[in-house]
């Protein structure tokens, strides 16, 4: 069903051309994202015509852009990802741990996205695995996945990782499952201190290797002593690592995680209106009791904030570690189930790839085949047409 409210695409279509003309320093990736969202589900990308085999009702369906930054193109990808993860759930506690970069580091990250976001993943993974392996804490090999978000509710740059961690892991010899204490994963202060040290070590090494670049108000940091002075107060500051209460059970993990995995900077349902060159959107003010508020910004400022969160092309924002790492996941999960006394899941049946509409209905519970007019007939494709201008040259769906 088509939305009746404002969408990010509406803002880009009305004001995007002027914004691009005024901001010539936009990256190729940012321009491609804007174009993809503007053309999404329009005649420019082509589509098909369907007709009901009972009442003759017709509808035109335009193709989507499939870009991972597009608010309209995430539902099927999210549903497919969650379905894939469902078979991997273990009968144990699950914890949600968030690692956040300080504002001063976030400024460096914005000018060096691929490198610094990669260091965020690396330092987080090393921190969790090191503390979990320490016999003073858990003494086990754990597994987890991490999801990168780069925004806060106000759409400003706020890079942080959401980590979902089963509450336990293998003993050093791999013969036992060592469970966390009920309701407690690992000490947050210990995690925070190690995370701070590891991240700063990796960042300094990157600087020494000539891998960091600084521009505009950070240009002075290209000089070694200035860079070290910039980092000095961060060595003593408290870095935010937040462990949320454990999930009620494995199934609740998927319900919760589904809110995070394929989220974009702002969803269309948070937009209130677009009037007189201004955008109003809903946001939650976490600093004042999670109060729901409405923020008004100019269309230029809205576009600027949205584009802050365009990821480098090919950058993986969901990553897996430990016994959930891609290489040995099936083997390690089988070992987990055995140690936890879980039944062996039935092997999936080999079958031909399903047609898009079948996959959509299976994963979302909503039918694209049923006629929306008579609710009796099936919608049959009677014509396929190409795009008017052709699709964007590059889709980033990673």
UniProtKB/Swiss-Prot annotation:
Keyword field: DNA recombination, DNA-binding, Plasmid, Transposable element, Transposition
GO biological process, one term: DNA transposition
InterPro entries according to UniProt: transpos_IS91, Transposase_32, Zn_Tnp
A single GO molecular function term of this UniProt record: transposase activity
UniProt cross-references to Pfam families, sorted A to Z: Y2_Tnp, Zn_Tnp_IS91
Similarity comment text for this entry: Belongs to the transposase 32 family.
Identification of the protein by name: Putative transposase y4qJ
Organism per entry: Sinorhizobium fredii (strain NBRC 101917 / NGR234)
């Amino acid at each position: 069903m088509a939305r009746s409210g404002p969408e990010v695409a509406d803002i880009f279509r009305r004001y995007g051309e002027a914004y691009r003309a005024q901001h010539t320093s936009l990256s190729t990736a940012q321009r491609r994202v804007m174009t993809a969202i503007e053309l999404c589900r329009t005649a420019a990308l082509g589509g098909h015509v369907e007709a009901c085999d009972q009442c003759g009702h017709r509808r035109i369906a335009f193709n989507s852009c499939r870009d991972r930054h597009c608010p309209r193109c995430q539902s099927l990808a999210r549903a497919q990802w969650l379905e894939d993860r469902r078979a991997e759930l273990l009968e144990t506690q699950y914890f949600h741990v968030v690692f956040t970069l300080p504002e001063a580091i976030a400024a460096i990250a914005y000018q060096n996205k691929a490198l610094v976001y990669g260091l965020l993943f690396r330092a987080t993974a090393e921190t969790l695995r090191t503390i979990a392996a320490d016999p003073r804490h858990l003494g086990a090999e754990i597994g987890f996945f991490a999801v990168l978000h780069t925004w806060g509710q106000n759409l400003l740059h706020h890079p942080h990782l959401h980590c979902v961690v089963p509450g336990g892991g293998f003993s050093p010899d791999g013969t036992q499952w060592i469970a966390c204490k009920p309701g407690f994963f690992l000490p947050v202060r210990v995690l925070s201190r190690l995370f701070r040290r590891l991240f700063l070590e990796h960042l300094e090494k990157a600087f020494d290797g000539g891998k960091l670049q600084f521009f505009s108000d950070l240009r002075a940091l290209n000089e070694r002593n200035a860079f070290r002075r910039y980092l000095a107060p961060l060595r003593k500051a408290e870095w935010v690592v937040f462990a949320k209460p454990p999930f009620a059970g494995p199934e609740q993990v998927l319900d919760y995680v589904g809110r995070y995995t394929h989220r974009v900077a702002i969803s269309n349902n948070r937009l209130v209106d677009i009037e007189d060159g201004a955008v109003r959107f809903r946001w939650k003010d976490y600093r004042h009791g999670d109060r729901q508020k409405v923020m008004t910004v100019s269309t230029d400022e809205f576009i600027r904030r949205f584009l802050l969160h365009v990821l480098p092309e090919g950058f993986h924002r969901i990553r897996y570690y430990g016994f959930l790492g891609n290489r040995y996941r099936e083997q390690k999960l089988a070992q987990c189930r055995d140690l936890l006394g879980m039944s062996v899941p039935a092997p999936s049946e080999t079958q031909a790839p399903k047609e898009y509409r079948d996959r959509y209905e299976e994963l979302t519970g909503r039918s694209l085949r049923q006629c929306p007019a008579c609710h009796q007939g099936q919608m049959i494709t009677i014509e396929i047409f190409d795009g008017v201008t052709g699709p964007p040259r590059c889709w980033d769906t990673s």
